Amino acid sequence: MVTPSPTSPVSPAARGGRRDNDQNLRAPVKKSRCPRLRRKEPLQPLNPCPLPGDSGVCDLFESPSSGSDGADSPGSSVARGCSPLTGLAQPLTPLDLQTFRDYGQSCYAFRKAQESHFHPRESLARQPQVTAESRCKLLSWLIPVHRQFGLSFESLCLTVNTLDRFLTTTPVAADCFQLLGVTSLLIACKQVEVHPPRVKQLLALCCGAFSRQQLCNLECIVLHKLHFSLGAPTISFFLEHFTHTRLEAGQAEVSEALEAQVLARAVAELSLADYAFTSYTPSLLAICCLALADRMLRLPRPVDLHLGEHPEEALQDCLGKLQMLVAINSTSLTHMLPLQICEKCSLSPSLQ
């Protein structure tokens, strides 16, 4: 007969070893290959103390086409919780220039041929409740939101293009216009950003005025109305192409060309909020922004305006409006630029 053996006293050392063995028997935890990066501080609405019923939208930019008298508005400074453009453009590498030599012209010809298909004309013609002023107000709020997320200029251009193209197809109620703005931003970021903003972050910026289901439903509507045709040629693409072109031709030093590109990008950001500039194609706006940036930086060899093969009348008309836009939003522009560029540029360039 088998009887249980008497238990022997266990030493403290043995008990400690047993606990170690128990810990080693735990199931292994599978670690994610791509750890999710979380922000240390949550994004806050740009308007920290919204009024009752206010969704956080505030005026930041002045628009020459909205009947302004040319003076900066009290809220036009981008210093209202918005950081300037992050430094200079990325330095060009030999691989970048070699890639441009191999494929630059063919990519430019392909994107240039697509402009007419993706260019929205008179996007507010069918909008009884959305005006040029409300569009300017929305984008003046959306541009700093885009910058607060640290997103690329390409995604901003795609956001505005998606917004305007949808406006040409469907009337939008005034109380849904901000929802359309953040939905367009989300669609654009999903195309080009590695880490697009989360839906709950975008909804938080709207101060809880909309639900997740409303945003997702509108996203589906926008995609179907645009027939999932989203890869529009942008000002960002043409700015980069013209910068590479002038460098390849030896028309500017690398540092000068990159500074002009950053300044031109800031001017283009201002133009995105003004409905008057929707009549110009992205390639025309890009070459004019770059030419104006050269004059503001007083570069000895400005970019050739005829690189985009646009009529002289259209070039001068666009340049004149851009100069007026810069003069009206001089305070905002200085807050958008790095300090080293602000010290070099003149906010009253001559068009001669």
Residue ranges and their predicted role:
Residues 1-182, 186-352:
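Acidic, serine/threonine-rich low-complexity regulatory regions at protein termini
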